[in-house]
Amino acid sequence: MQQPQPQGQQQPGPGQQLGVQGAAPGAGGGPGGGPGPGPCLRRELKLLESIFHRGHERFRIASACLDELSCEFLLAGAGGAGAGAAPGPHLPSRGSVPGDPVRIHCNITESYPAVPPIWSVESDDPNLAAVLERLVDIKKGNTLLLQHLKRIISDLCKLYNLPQHPDVEMLDQPLPAEQCTQEEVSSEDEDEEMPEDTEDLDHYEMKEEEPAEGKKSEDDGIGKENLAILEKIKKNQRQDYLNGAVSGSVQATDRLMKELRDIYRSQSFKGGNYAVELVNDSLYDWNVKLLKVDQDSALHNDLQILKEKEGADFILLNFSFKDNFPFDPPFVRVVSPVLSGGYVLGGGAICMELLTKQGWSSAYSIESVIMQISATLVKGKARVQFGANKSQYSLTRAQQSYKSLVQIHEKNGWYTPPKEDG
């Protein structure tokens, strides 16, 4: 099953995607809420590249930028496996040969370090899965990237019966104090408190009419059409209350109203990256159209062909929310078109840990989840299946296939199913 951050064939194809639980993941620098990565991250990356350069004998930083990191763990001398030896339990088992490096990828959200880095590995080896899953224990600090990599390298050395490399200890050296400001430290606490505070404000707003000045501030940046939608939702809620037909919960309704307002203000939304429609005016049932994907991807080309054939050049997702949102994730599935790859399961469910109870955080924003799914489809090499039977995508089948995958994960750890399984 896929972790929050996707990687493509050059990253995992049929291989494993295993990540660390974090908040609001915005792949490729997508919106994640909160301040963007600051000077600390730049200093961390610079330190990493200076220690684990491309000529390092054990661990190498292949590429690094503010939102993504690729690195390699070299297996020379691992487990005594000689050339041509059959892969053992501690050697890459899929898509590689003994001695190939372990390729590891990291995505960094805009909210780092309040949001931990999210890791993935190009392998379906459960031993590597365990290495990444243990990173969930490291959640706090301004140098999470360094802390995570120290744990990864140390655990990989143990896994492959290699001596601990002395350069790993260099990751403990402090960064210059002037680069990591108190503002960055305090922003982490502010981010963690934000959902509760904003929910309280939203709850008040639903009960009482805001003063004109306060309402103007709340509506700032939202277009007239979308303001009309918000007003209609409030009107329907009041009417349902009067009729004794209230659905959902105050907690979920308040948070979903906040999420919708934030989306309407978002530059990604206004820029046409995606669109949101409420199904039957229900705040708990969203249709999301992914209107733009990476133009260099095969998926983008497929969508252009789809437009010529069927007049639709978008991917339609459905988000279904329960009464206990935001403490449980939405159920997300692909409605159309039928896709292969991209970690899309039978029925259209999406195989990502962040969409499970274990990987979900109430601090996630819905926009960042949308952007993350878009990135996952592209990096997972999703392709449109032209001529496929559209009836194979349904809510019931998606729920069944996803439930089955979650049960397997709980017993055996995270893994990516074979391509033929979606």
Swiss-Prot record:
Pfam families: UQ_con (PF00179). It catalyses: S-ubiquitinyl-[E1 ubiquitin-activating enzyme]-L-cysteine + [E2 ubiquitin-conjugating enzyme]-L-cysteine = [E1 ubiquitin-activating enzyme]-L-cysteine + S-ubiquitinyl-[E2 ubiquitin-conjugating enzyme]-L-cysteine. Disruption phenotype: No reproductive defects in males but females have reduced litter size due to embryo implantation failure, normal ovulation but a longer estrus cycle, reduced levels of serum prolactin at the beginning of lactation, abnormal sexual behavior and show reduced offspring care. Keywords: Acetylation, ATP-binding, Cell projection, Cytoplasm, Nucleotide-binding, Nucleus, Transferase, Ubl conjugation, Ubl conjugation pathway. Residues 212-221 have a biased composition (Basic and acidic residues). Residues 1-24 have a biased composition (Low complexity). Autoubiquitinated in vitro in the presence of NEDD4L. Residues 1-40, 173-221 are annotated as: Disordered. The modification N-acetylmethionine is found at residue 1. It is an enzyme of class 2 (transferase). GO terms for molecular function: ATP binding; ubiquitin conjugating enzyme activity. Residues 251-415 form the UBC core domain. Gene3D superfamilies: Ubiquitin Conjugating Enzyme (3.10.110.10). Belongs to the ubiquitin-conjugating enzyme family. This is Ubiquitin-conjugating enzyme E2 Q1. The gene is Ube2q1.
